[in-house]
Amino acid sequence: MMFRDQVGMLSGWFKGWNECEQTVALLSLLKRVSRTQARFLQICLEHSLVDCTELHILEGEANNPAIINQWQQESKDKVISQLLTHLPLLKPGNIDAKMAYMKLLPKILAHSIEHNQHIEESRQLLSYALIHPATSLDDRSALAMWLNHLEDRTSGNFSTQSRCRSDSLDYGQMQYYHQRQNSDDKQNGWPNSRDSGICISSSGWQEKNTGCENGHLPLYSSSSVPSTINAIGTSTILSGQTHHSSLKRSVSLTPPMNVPNQPLGHGWMSHEDLRARGSQGIPSDHAPLSPQSSVASSGSGGSEHLEEQSTACNTFQDEGSGMKDVPAWLKSLRLHKYAALFSHITYDEMMSLNECHLEAQNVTKGARHKIVISIQKLKERHNLLKTLERDVLEGGNLRVPLQELHQIILTPIKACFPQNSNTEEHDQEADSQPPLLASKNQATESKDSASGGIQQHHIGNCESESGGVPLPESDLPGQFTRVMGKVCTQLLVSRPDEENISSYLQLIDKCLTHDAFTETQKKRLLSWKQQVQKLFRSFPRKSLLDVAGYRQQRKTSVDVLIGSRGFGQSNSLPTAGSVGSGIARRNPRQFQIPSRNLPSTRLSLLGASSLLGATQRASASNPAMLKQGRQNLWFANPGGSNSMPSRSHSSVQRTRSLPVHTSPQTMLMFQQQDFQVPVTEPDINNRLESLCLSMTEHALGDGVDRTSTI
């Protein structure tokens, strides 16, 4: 696809967004430009707004605290309209006006959520507030709680529009997370947000030597930008390979059949400039993937025959046919010139194609062989998903399974509607199961939730798709959802990995807009997305940087001192700290995690009913493996589930094991005072072995427990 085609397609999508979504998308693209480009854009914007007197009047009102305070006497409908118009014009550094906005916003959000009104407008207000350079880190922290309330409100009234529109907050959320963590990504050559000298003011972009009030808006690149923004910013513009499944962010964003022939920016970019890149016309919905418009369609035989078939019935347009993603899949295989050949056949007919059928259609020998091999790989996806499910359960690196899932979701997937309802009934039963340990630890868990922790039932919900009922090979969406549930559990209990979390959220966004997944599956996926997002929000400031530093030092580390709860490691059960002792790190810096003061009985309950996975129980129930289990059943490497086992010189050897339920507070509180525990290594080994035996005995006595989430 030529540059002009890409610009035209992007312009078509841009017109389908509301003003807030357009602003978020542009801001995401602008963070990728250099300083010179940013300065040029600033000049263009300032020049175009010189004679805009109405804007200057609105800007004066937006920065007048007296006028903002008067809005409190107006009706809620009018106040929301005024906020959407004036909040983007707030100048950084105007503390009085900002405080007036911060007093008014919670009242409006509370009214909208309570009466279930103006939900979309509330999302837009939160998006503006979270990415605005005038709001400080504390202001964003105060507003972050409203994200959960909005998500809970939309999840109760689940619909395609509300699900897709909820993504309009993703960029603001991720921007907020990065500012909390002070990430120093320098992929663009810009030092960081505080050194770039770029901030937003009333007249556009201004270059300053000092930052805005809160260090202004960071414009560095990030892997956690929502999938839609990444797809538009990288896949479409840079690589030229489009995957329509990843670009359908909402119903209104589907590109029109005929995109207007005009460049992006109107007067800023002439037609001659665009034509210099090379262009052959404006594409339709799937134009770049068809032999008629593709610049790569010439070369081998059979093209005339394919053109004749292009007017036949197009199965690419049929909902639930499984053929909508075939053009993008063929393009990824460099076989898009044969898209017309697949446009008049069904999904089942495509899966049964062989070289004889293709030869009859005048397909060249090399292309025939490549198509047959690719179809065979499609048939192996179900087994691959089952393998990925086992790999995720065993722990280890989540990056490879996530990459495989990204590849699978881009392939053609047909919706599966089983004739009997056994699977659906099982899924409903799994959803209706009581939360894990809720009756035993409800008070404690609610306290953890109030402080930002993860409740145990979140992990149970992630496994609602992972029942023992085998799925048919044709049910790829069901098997895919099952693996996504396993990955959700690993993310919730493992050490935080920003790249994995971002990749997982992008996967869910693609699934939510995919017509092969049922509404029940999409509800689960949306629930898991909200759980992972809540986990991401609960990370303390600089936590990811601390974890990165901790991983670099893991070869010289033995363990982190653990309080009575004993969940300092993401991939191990309570160690010596759980029995009243700790292990001194060989690193000069020592850390201490304060005790959560849980009763000793709860530790036994956790060890018996939830901390043992199916793999561990199988090992523990085998007498031949019991001795081995005493040595390596519990202790995983300190790098977490997403790092390779550490070859530490410590006397405590760690192997990979299933992670346990934990909370981000106990996982990530590494900024504590120094602490030394005088204890000998033989004493440590004895206590650890005793703890292993105790946990194994509890596990063997709990073999029929069905509340485990693994």
UniProtKB/Swiss-Prot annotation:
GO CC annotation: dendrite; P-body; synapse
Membrane-spanning ranges: none
Compositional bias per record (Polar residues), positions renumbered to this chain: 309-318
Protein location: Cytoplasm; Cell projection, Dendrite; Synapse, Synaptosome
Region (Disordered): 276-319, 441-476
GO biological process: nuclear-transcribed mRNA poly(A) tail shortening
Keyword Secreted: no
Highest taxon listed in the record's lineage: Eukaryota
One MF annotation (Gene Ontology) recorded for this entry: translation repressor activity
Keywords: Cell projection, Cytoplasm, Repressor, Synapse, Synaptosome, Translation regulation
Keyword Cytoplasm: yes
Primary location class: cytoplasm
Ranges of residues in domain SAM: 319-379
Function summary: Acts as a translational repressor.
PANTHER family assigned to the protein according to its UniProt record, in alphabetical order: PROTEIN SMAUG HOMOLOG 1 (PTHR12515:SF8), STERILE ALPHA MOTIF DOMAIN CONTAINING PROTEIN 4-RELATED (PTHR12515)
Recorded family membership: Belongs to the SMAUG family.
Protein name: Protein Smaug homolog 1
